[in-house]
Amino acid sequence: MCGIVGYVGGREACPVLLKGLHRLEYRGYDSAGVAMVGKDGALNVYKCKGKVSDLEHFLEGKELGGSIGIAHTRWATHGVPNDVNAHPHYSESENIALIHNGIIENYRVLKDALEENGYTFRSSTDSEVLVNLIEYIRTTGGCTLLEAVQQALRQVVGAYALAVIEKGNRDEIIAARQSSPMAIGIGEGEFFLSSDAASVIEYTQDFVYVNDGEIAVINRHKPLKIVTLDNHEGRVDIKKLQMSISQLEKGGYPHFMLKEIYEQPKTIVDCIRGRISPDTYEVKLSGVIDNRGKFLAARRIVFVACGTSWHAALIGEHLIENICRIPVEVEYASEFRYRNPIINADDIVIAVSQSGETADTLAAVELARKAGAFVFGICNVVGSSIARATDSGAYIHVGPEIGVASTKAFTGQVTVMAMLALAVGREKGTVTEEYYREVAKGLLELPAVLEDVLGLGDRIADLSKIFTYAHNFIYLGRGYNYPTALEGALKLKEISYIHAEGYPAAEMKHGAIALIDNEMPTVAIATPDNTYEKTASNIEEIRARGGKIIAVIARDDTHVRRSADYTIEVPVVTDCLMPIVVSVPLQLLAYYIAVNKGRNVDQPRNLAKSVTVE
């Protein structure tokens, strides 16, 4: 949600800012803007509702000189999407400009106080309150911009990542963070600021990740300085980010989502590389090896996640309970943190997040740590907030995921959970050697299996045309594939805007069957497992009521094939890995239906890639 970019150095700032904003478009936004200090010291703010391309058109003919600037893509929280509410925001005197991600919870109190001191406001945002508070402190207290930011943020309740520049100062950006991501790229005599380091990766691979409660003083003529709100010196810890520009491009595909679907054979290879021996099938996860005692002593494992990551966690529940015989609970992070959960020191809390910045999941991590639990993270983005806040963890290593609808991150998360279950199960002695080797071997073979499944692309594209104008879908699955049904339904609703719901197949008769008619398609996952015959019976019930059935079946299936109107035939792997195999054709089905409907597949309406506000 929202994106921040900043630059100070020897280059022209505007091209750097605009390129960075384009790289952040995947996060979801409704308006964009830039602020720059020109060579004459003038502070210029340009912003508009719409896409970054609309901003570029708006900037034609404007004064864009200067080597310092900040830029922003906004996802509306306070105030409707329009030009006035877009960022950056001027202070009332237009001497200071600010960009801000997050939510200021006590903005109303602060705004009332400023209005009593004569301030008026152009917008209805909480962010404009913050920039005017900084200006008020600066002018009444005769302090520096840094001191004004420090004093202002001591009064703020809420989350923020912000950057501030001021008229006449061509050398310095003040930036701060609390519960919202911020990274600073370090170059030769120049600095790059971003809410996602990947947006400026072409300029540097050296990054400092700002921690909660820290303020960065970014001056082109001085080393980077980190201080706290109380003016204690912070640590400048430079991390190397290994990423190539090609990972951020479409590579000839029409959409990032399609590219990321087709990358999955490779991303599974990257996910398991060095973690499973092709000779002995031994699974080694350093996060388990280094914390063996914690896993052996665990009374319970609790997953906390949101969205697609929550669906992956449901599969993780099956994996760990079946293989490790440890009780597992799966919680929505947004609910977990507010219901006073019972967490003990012998619990393990596993936080799952692609970005590692999901606000509710990060808050759940902090709650679990305060309760004394051991917290393990499963993330994609190296150096992310959750990766740094957890006691240990495992990266999924699937590379940048730009499409808002998650695809390769989901299969990567499930792959890591399978390896985690095997590693812990062997340590506990709860998995047979035969099954251990079967699953480990299956993981090594997954890339080839997914290449095979992706060969269904043309078949699924043709099938999608039949259902483009459906208004509702039901997805059914059982066991390991109930979460897969949930995920398939989520993919469809996210990018096509068709209402879709996932159910355990047996639960259909407890309500959802009332919806079945010839205008309600059902996607039924009926691959071989111990519930196959039951699922086949559920499909017959749908058929008897005139429902259209798309069945995901094994290639050698002869039973369900006769009941379904259409089939998607997939290769069979060991039971616990079937969700990875089945999810790929469901991703393709959602993709092609959305394309047929002319949807913006990579940036669906109202959605953001990384939900960094509560």
Question: What are these language model-derived features?
Answer:
Residues M1-K250, P254, K266-R299, Y338, ...:
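Conserved short alpha-helical segments that host acidic/polar catalytic motifs at enzyme active sites
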